[in-house]
């Protein structure tokens, strides 16, 4: 199935990875170009990309699946979890650290319970143990009914168990 935007461009392309947001962001009627300048990788191969223009942190699994986006840039970086001028990223265990060059501060982000569930489910799935990850994916869907990754994980679990019709249903929900 192909989906197109009003301009005629295909929006659901499966042959490429979508890193971060669109090329341009808009803030207070001004357009800015995205700039993924810094990366760090944790011990399990999950990686974090820092967009220094928009102040966002993009969290990916080892297979390049986007897991979460957090942080932001509000101009002065005075709101919790936002930055004025993010200049570095570091990952240590279950924490992500961002250095703000203008404010001279380091912000520490801790993994949430939901993030921990996504991380564990994705680790199990990437190891090929789809059925073992099923319970975690079900919990994720119960917390976020819009989790495409959760539906994809359940599709793999049902496929692994030979439940092909159910697998197809979950794959459709996951837009896979």
Regions found by a protein language model. Name each.
Residues 46-49, 95-99:
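Conserved beta-propeller blade signature
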Residues 6-35, 63-87, 123-124:
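Gly/Pro-rich loop segments of beta-rich domains
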């Amino acid at each position: 199935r192909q989906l197109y935007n009003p301009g005629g461009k295909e929006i659901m392309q499966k042959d490429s990875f979508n890193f971060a947001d669109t090329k341009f962001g808009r803030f207070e009627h001004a357009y800015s170009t995205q700039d993924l300048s810094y990366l760090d990788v944790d011990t399990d191969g999950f990686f974090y990309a820092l967009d220094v223009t928009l102040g966002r942190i993009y969290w990916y699994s080892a297979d390049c699946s986007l897991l979460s986006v957090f942080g932001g840039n509000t101009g002065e970086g005075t709101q919790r979890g936002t930055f004025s001028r993010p200049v570095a990223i570091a990952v240590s265990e279950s924490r992500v650290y961002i250095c703000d060059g203008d404010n001279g501060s380091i912000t520490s982000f801790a993994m949430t319970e939901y993030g921990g569930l996504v991380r564990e489910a994705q680790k199990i799935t990437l190891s090929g143990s789809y059925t073992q990850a099923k319970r975690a994916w079900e919990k994720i869907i119960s917390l976020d009914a819009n989790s495409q990754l959760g539906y994809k994980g359940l599709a793999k679990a049902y496929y692994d168990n030979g439940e092909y019709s159910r697998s197809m249903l979950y794959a459709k929900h996951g837009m896979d």
